[in-house]
């Protein structure tokens, strides 16, 4: 209420305390109570990892919007999926080729923004999220952690996804 009275046009509520950090579950009941106590839009955040989680938060808390955090790591298309899901549209599963193309674009943008040395090191963690749950992810992750050049990283990922395509088909 204090924030609303101070002139805020919206409030984002993360259903965890600083002490809880990433442990346990976000307190959606608290988010719902905030929504019920103010007239300005409330955006709920916490434990949104799937399109179904987003719908569930909307239904359970009556928030005006949802914010996705860690659920977007390695899964940036979650935003498209949520919108399509909420609109009742068919959700097209992302292919491994599309995933590779997104990773390569991510690498290019990161290198352009931060330079090769910093970007390749930072991309290691992002790639780990992208390939999570894919076959041989641990092996490829170990290889990627030794790479410090963009062209080597691109070649490694391309080879991995080509092998993946052959194994699947």
Pin down the residues of each PLM region:
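Glycine-rich, proline-tolerant flexible connector loops at the mouths of alpha/beta enzymes
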Residues: 13-23
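Alpha/beta catalytic cores of nucleotide-metabolism and tRNA/nucleoside-modifying enzymes
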Residues: 1-10, 22, 29, 33-44, ...
């Amino acid at each position: 209420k204090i924030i609303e009275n101070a002139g805020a046009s919206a409030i984002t509520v993360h259903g965890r305390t600083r002490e809880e950090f990433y442990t346990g579950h976000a307190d959606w009941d608290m988010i719902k109570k905030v929504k019920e106590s103010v007239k300005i839009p409330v955006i709920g955040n916490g434990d949104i990892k799937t399109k179904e989680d987003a719908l569930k938060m909307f239904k359970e808390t009556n928030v005006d919007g949802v914010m996705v955090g860690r659920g977007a790591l390695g899964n940036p298309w979650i935003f498209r999926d949520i919108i399509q899901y909420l609109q009742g549209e068919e959700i097209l599963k992302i292919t491994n080729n599309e995933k590779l193309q997104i990773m390569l674009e991510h690498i290019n943008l990161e290198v352009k923004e931060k330079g090769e040395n910093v970007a390749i090191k930072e991309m290691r963690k992002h790639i780990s999220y992208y390939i999570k749950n894919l076959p041989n992810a641990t092996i490829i992750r170990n290889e990627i952690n030794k790479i410090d050049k963009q062209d080597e990283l691109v070649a490694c990922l391309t080879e991995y996804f080509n092998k993946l395509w052959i194994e699947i088909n």
